[in-house]
Amino acid sequence: MTDLVKLTIAQSHKLLKDHKISSAELTKAHLERIEKLEPEIKAFMTVCPETALSQAEAADKAIKQGDIRPLTGIPMALKDVLCTKGIRTTCSSKMLENFVPPYNAHVVDKLAKEGAVLLGKTNMDEFAMGSSTENSAYFTTRNPWNTDKVPGGSSGGSAACVAASEAVFSLGSDTGGSIRQPASFCSVTGYKPSYGMVSRYGLVAFASSLDQIGPFTKDAMDCALVMNAIAGFDDRDSTSVPQTVPDFSSGLDGNIKGFKLGVPKEYFSQNMRPDITEKINDALGVLSGLGASIDREVSLPHTPYALAVYYILAPSEASANLSRYDGVKYGYSYNPTENMWEAMEKTRAKGFGPEVKRRIMIGTYALSAGYYDAWYVKAQKVRTLISQEFNNAFEKYDALITPTTPNLPFSIGEKLNDPFEMYMCDTCTIPINIAGLPAVSIPAGFVDGLPVGLQIIGKPFADQTTMRIAHAFQCATAWHKETPRL
């Protein structure tokens, strides 16, 4: 008997289409897996068994009538930063502990239209601020490969549930690496689309000029199938780009002969572990063997400034976006009967966690009179320089190849009291958000039993190219097929 929880989207779809399994069977298998593993992994904020089984039943009826799409009947999970009508959406914050949205995020509606089955909402760093999922106001998600390690963040629950085979796929959000870094730590495929490719409507905002929604899957083909479902223009999101959505799965034939790939030197900095560099070199050898040309002498000299730029711009946007949480309109309220200003002050003091408060303070400082030009405006100028450097590089190369992270999954609590060390986890991913580029992290091996991720960065809206390279690499390797022993 096929182990149903190990199936990819493509494999599940074929079995459903051939009537060899039902969505109800597939969904029950994943719910049983969740029940078994959640006490240890803690990937889910909310599990929705009744909703899932009802949606699975509807999917089975549609399949019997011959109405089946690539995601019909496929069990999935959503990061708890995406609004779900009638289902609690907390952002893993006390501030939204009991918030139930009256509407769905655009991507949630699109997945429902495709017939996907919602298993539940996943844990995350509070308001998507963090790199380990330790900043959740409720509990810390654990890495399925080693439960003493973090799964990455901020979308740690979404990465962990796919790695642990608790869901066939999941959605996360990526502001500075929050899909790709946990994908690397959990050895799954994690994709950040081009900025504007996927509607952010119904995504609780962290930094609006950087946020983007994307999938976690078991391989690049599955990633393409999910992107086919969620990409596209939405007039409710002013940053959504009105263009024809490509078929992300077309051209995934394993052939990248003649592709020109660049390797930026700045991504192999002093804080990069040598054993990770070794794994990336092995991966470059695979890509070269597939017929791609590799140039290891690419330079993007403004890369070292990206971290500083990010930690001025992202907190600045966050301080504005989070000003709406005042204890009056919705969400947590400390004591609405007190003086309004005092109640608002105490609501924010007790409703937000320490990392969120830290970033609000940084952002408020950067936007304040006397510092706006010195910090915020200057950061925007450097952002432009970083984007221009990428554009110049893409005049010569089809894609850029880097490590996803400079470090391996670290122990729970190891970096929690050192914000700078935590921020350094995203040095390889942040520049891509600053430039609005597409990028994917795929499994590239293991060091000491812990996963290493390879990052493939594409030109703006050349999302298909990144997918083609990722798929070709996975056709030639088997790292993505490895699963943790649980």
From Swiss-Prot:
Active site per the UniProt annotation: K79, S154, S178
Enzyme class: ligase
Residues forming coiled coils: none
InterPro entries: Amidase (IPR000120), Amidase_CS (IPR020556), Amidase_dom (IPR023631), AS_sf (IPR036928), GatA (IPR004412)
HAMAP family xrefs: GatA
Keywords per UniProt: ATP-binding, Ligase, Nucleotide-binding, Protein biosynthesis
Similarity comment: Belongs to the amidase family. GatA subfamily.
The protein's Enzyme Commission number: 6.3.5.7
GO biological process, one term: translation
Record's protein name: Glutamyl-tRNA(Gln) amidotransferase subunit A
